[in-house]
Amino acid sequence: MEVILLSKIKKLGDSGAIVHVKSGYARNFLIPKGKAILASKKNIESFEAQRVELEKENISKLLIAQSRAEKIKTIKSITIPSKVGKEGKIFGSIGIRNIIKEMNLLGIKVNKKEIKLPNGVLRQVGEHKVIFQPHNEVCEYFIVNIISKK
């Protein structure tokens, strides 16, 4: 099934590209999520007229994401105190919600989807690398330092 991508999709194509995908992927994911439209003659003509507006919108989203990533760069690390048992293991785990809570205290608003934990939830005391990805093309790393709560 031929579709026109309305936004950049990793490993598929850029905005405005006409790509061939499986019909189930198009009908069940791309089209309902507003990431693509069917590539009929009528849609291709109307999309060409809207292309400039969509490109401006994508550029503005990218600039906003880059400015948010610059804020993250200034922080570099976040410290989260936690109860610790023997051998440096914490009771429970530190997840995305805990990290977002600490970032909100620092005055930085982030969504749950923008934080990625490469090794899963954090269960050890020490420094852990976390990924902040507000946009497909923008990626920034920061450190979460888990310390013992006394």
Swiss-Prot record:
InterPro entries, sorted: Ribosomal_bL9, Ribosomal_bL9/RNase_H1_N, Ribosomal_bL9_bac/chp, Ribosomal_bL9_C, Ribosomal_bL9_C_sf, Ribosomal_bL9_N, Ribosomal_bL9_N_sf
GO biological process per UniProt: translation
Keywords: Ribonucleoprotein, Ribosomal protein, RNA-binding, rRNA-binding
GO cellular component: ribonucleoprotein complex; ribosome
GO molecular function, one term: rRNA binding
Function comment: Binds to the 23S rRNA.
Family: Belongs to the bacterial ribosomal protein bL9 family.
PANTHER family linked to this entry: 50S RIBOSOMAL PROTEIN L9 (PTHR21368)
UniProt-recorded name of the protein: Large ribosomal subunit protein bL9
The gene coding this protein: rplI
